[in-house]
């Protein structure tokens, strides 16, 4: 993150042989740059207005510093949040390991409880790590995206049947016609988005609440909508639901609330495909969340995004 600053400082030192500005002025600029490090990313270069050439350069550098500071802060916050999320399952595993060591040999009930809890926490950690790796690859632009032409209604049907198998006591209502709705996208990633939205609707809905899955076509786009009859989202929370590690209900148990990364992943996928999200929610009534993708003729040839 800080490498550009080091390069700028070196460049400023070399500029004295290439410009009519004095060596003293350029060395002063280089000195200001050298003072900026990870602990002082909020520092900015301040030069007198009379030094027009240097001032234009300083303004460009300050703008770059703003971007670096924002990216660095986000990175540090992400690492801090990830560490916090991993700390809890590790503590639970350690606690049950101690329980096993003390009582496991003589108490079958304690043995089974500990094994179940350790497996559950290990699975949660695995899911969290996989999601973190996905977002890291997305941030580094190394996450593969392999688009193919397919019918979005067929994919929605697959997701709906899977949800019905997993949550056999819930009511899922499909809403789409017989006409195909073709798109060109990474089928696995779009399926992942649908699963994330469906799982959230189930998670935040009462047992007797219905979940709707709609697929519709509009001019140039395909729309997928998941609607529930759940708790809804407070107006102040809607702008943050795609933030990493954000949970709409902070009081919920961590296992019920999930990792707080699902919607961040969903947004990355949809953004990468040139689409966007639309969210409508009312507390005590439910949430309707849609994502739109560019539509494509069924005969569209595969090509990389």
Please tell me what each predicted stretch does.
Residues 140-145, 178-185:
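Conserved micro-motifs of the catalytic ATP-binding
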Residues 146-161:
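A conserved beta-strand-to-alpha-helix junction within the catalytic ATP-binding
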Residues 201-202:
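Short helix-loop "hinge" at the ATP-lid/N-box region of the Bergerat-fold HATPase_c
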Residues 152, 232-243:
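Short helix N-cap motif at coil->helix boundaries in the Bergerat
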Residues 69, 101-108, 116:
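Short acidic helix/loop segment immediately C-terminal to the autophosphorylated histidine
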Residues 1-79, 97-101, 137, 244, ...:
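Membrane-proximal HAMP signal-relay module
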Residues 120-125:
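Short alpha-helical segment of the dimerization/phosphotransfer core of two-component systems
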Residues 270-305:
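C-terminal end segment of the histidine kinase catalytic
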């Amino acid at each position: 993150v800080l490498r550009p600053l080091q390069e700028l400082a070196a460049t400023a030192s070399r500029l004295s042989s290439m410009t009519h500005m004095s060596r003293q002025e350029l060395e002063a600029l280089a000195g200001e740059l050298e003072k900026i490090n990870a602990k002082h990313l909020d520092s900015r270069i301040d030069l007198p207005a009379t030094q027009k050439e240097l001032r234009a350069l300083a303004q460009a550098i300050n703008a770059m510093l703003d971007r670096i500071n924002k990216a660095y802060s986000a990175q540090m916050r992400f690492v801090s949040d990830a560490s916090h999320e991993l700390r809890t399952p590790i503590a639970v595993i350690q606690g049950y390991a101690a329980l096993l060591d003390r009582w496991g040999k003589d108490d079958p009930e304690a043995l089974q409880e500990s094994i179940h809890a350790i497996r559950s926490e290990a699975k949660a950690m695995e899911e969290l790590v996989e999601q973190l790796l996905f977002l890291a690859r997305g941030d580094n632009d190394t996450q593969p995206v392999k688009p193919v032409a397919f019918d979005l209604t067929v994919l929605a049907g697959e997701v709906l049947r899977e949800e019905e198998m997993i949550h056999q006591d819930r009511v899922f209502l499909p809403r789409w016609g017989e006409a195909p709705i073709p798109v060109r996208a990474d089928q696995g990633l779009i399926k992942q988005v649908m699963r994330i939205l469906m799982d959230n609707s189930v998670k935040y809905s009462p047992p007797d609440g219905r979940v709707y899955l709609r697929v519709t076509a509009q001019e140039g786009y395909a729309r997928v909508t998941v609607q529930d009859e759940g708790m809804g989202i407070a107006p102040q929370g809607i702008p943050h639901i795609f933030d990493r590690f954000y949970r709409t209900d902070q009081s919920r148990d961590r296992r019920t609330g999930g990792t707080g990364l699902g919607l961040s992943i969903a947004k990355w996928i949809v953004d990468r495909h040139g689409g966007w999200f639309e969210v409508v929610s009312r507390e005590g009534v439910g949430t309707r969340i849609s994502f739109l993708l560019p539509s494509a003729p069924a005969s569209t040839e595969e090509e990389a995004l």
